[in-house]
Regions:
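Terminal, low-structured helical/coil segments at or just beyond the last alpha-helical repeat
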Residues: 338-366
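TPR/TPR-like (Sel1-like) alpha-helical repeat modules
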Residues: 314-337
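A generic structural signal for well-ordered alpha-helical surface patches
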Residues: 307-308, 324-327, 353
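Short, well-ordered coil↔helix boundary/capping segments
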Residues: 300, 316-323, 345-349
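Acidic, proline/glycine-rich low-complexity intrinsically disordered segments
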Residues: 1-316
Length: 366
């Protein structure tokens, strides 16, 4: 539902995890709207019984908590996507009558024919978002099963590409992982792909593994044209921009990702990492420390922002703080070494040299 609404031009839609932070809580709708910075709230319930699904939904005006629209939808369980499309159409009509039907049609995307494949994909997401070696393996297992059932499911291929890329970079630079990452990325970026999420992941993976930053940014711009409310796409765009020393774009897109998803902790470490890195390359080391700290808070098990924090403290001339951060980095990733990180070749040599020089100053393993 959130994905479909986000694709409609003219709508600013808060991401799933931020929205769901209030689920099950007795919170005044006006307070929720104020915290998220939105004008309307959509709430409702889904019930399933004897092969039927019933969706009750209501739209509230955030400033007054008054009802704008309410309705109930019912259909067969296998028609859940049709119910979502109908709900999208009604809500868009209630919020902005001038939105054209053609834009509602653009919100309808290709989906896997099998709900089983979709369910496996959904179950893989939290493991992928954790971005640790063990969780990445779990995600790849589920994504592999999903793709077996639905070989053309580009969203699953996008996540598989990302997971294989992460495993390649953080688990010994196994060339088979790199090949798998690029293979899935190519499918995610295929000629029939119009899924902004899959496009964003495929572009990010190719940028990291081939350093074709210009091509990746072109694809990311296409993805954002399809879905201008994608926090994930803006986050990946910020990372690619930081990796390629496009400071202004990295800052702009990093903050845009955070604005779209202010409470989305499982994914906010992406824009925070981008902001930490781009500020390091720009010589703004206090900002590096600040954003690296936020990235660690969002995902403590992800090792890379710990490295950025080390580098930021070195840049500020605080070697003692850098050594504390370095010890924490090794607790999270005992196998981390500066040489192995350098061999990932994530950035062009001048940028990588600056970062690894700072890490070496903190006495991290070579």
């Amino acid at each position: 539902m959130i994905t479909n609404l986000s694709k409609v031009s003219g709508l600013f839609v808060i991401a799933r995890n931020s929205s769901f932070a209030f689920r099950g809580k007795d919170t005044d709708p006006r307070a929720i709207a104020s915290e998220l910075g939105v004008r309307y709230l959509l709430q409702g319930s889904v019930r399933r019984s004897a092969g039927r699904i019933r969706i009750n939904a209501q739209l509230l005006e955030g400033s007054t908590a008054s009802h704008v629209w309410a309705d109930r939808f019912e259909g067969a369980a296998e028609d859940v996507f049709d119910l979502q499309d109908r709900l999208t159409e009604y809500i868009v009509g209630a919020i902005e009558p001038s939105v054209r039907r053609a834009e509602i049609n653009r919100a309808r995307r290709k989906r896997p024919e099998s709900l089983d494949a979709y369910d496996l994909y959904l179950r893989a997401l939290p493991h992928a978002h954790a971005n640790t070696p063990s969780e990445t393996d779990k995600a790849l297992h589920l994504l592999g099963r999903s793709i077996e059932l639905e070989p053309d499911f580009v969203a699953a291929h996008g996540y598989a590409a990302w997971c294989y890329e992460q495993r390649f970079l953080r688990n010994g630079l196994d060339l088979s992982d790199k090949a798998a990452a690029l293979r899935h990325a190519d499918i995610a970026l295929g000629v029939n792909s119009d899924d902004p999420q899959a496009m964003s992941m495929g572009a990010f993976v190719r940028a990291n593994l081939t350093r074709d930053y210009e091509g990746a940014l072109e694809v990311l711009d296409q993805a954002l044209a399809l879905n201008h409310n994608s926090a994930l796409a803006f986050g990946f765009s910020a990372l690619v921009s930081a990796h390629s020393e496009r400071h202004e774009r990295a800052v702009e897109h990093g903050h845009k990702a955070l604005r779209l998803s202010p409470l989305d902790d499982p994914l906010n470490y992406h824009p925070y990492c981008a902001l930490a890195l781009t500020h390091f390359f720009a010589g703004s080391f206090a900002e590096t420390v600040s954003y690296a700290t936020l990235a660690i808070r969002a995902n403590p098990g992800f090792s890379i922002p710990h490295a950025y924090l080390v580098a930021g403290h070195i840049g500020l001339g605080k070697p003692d703080a850098a050594r504390v951060a370095a010890r924490r980095l090794l607790e999270v990733s005992p196998a981390f070494s500066v040489g192995a990180y350098e061999r990932t070749e994530l950035f062009r040599p001048p940028l990588m040299d600056a970062l690894t020089a700072a890490l070496r100053t903190a006495d991290l393993p070579e």
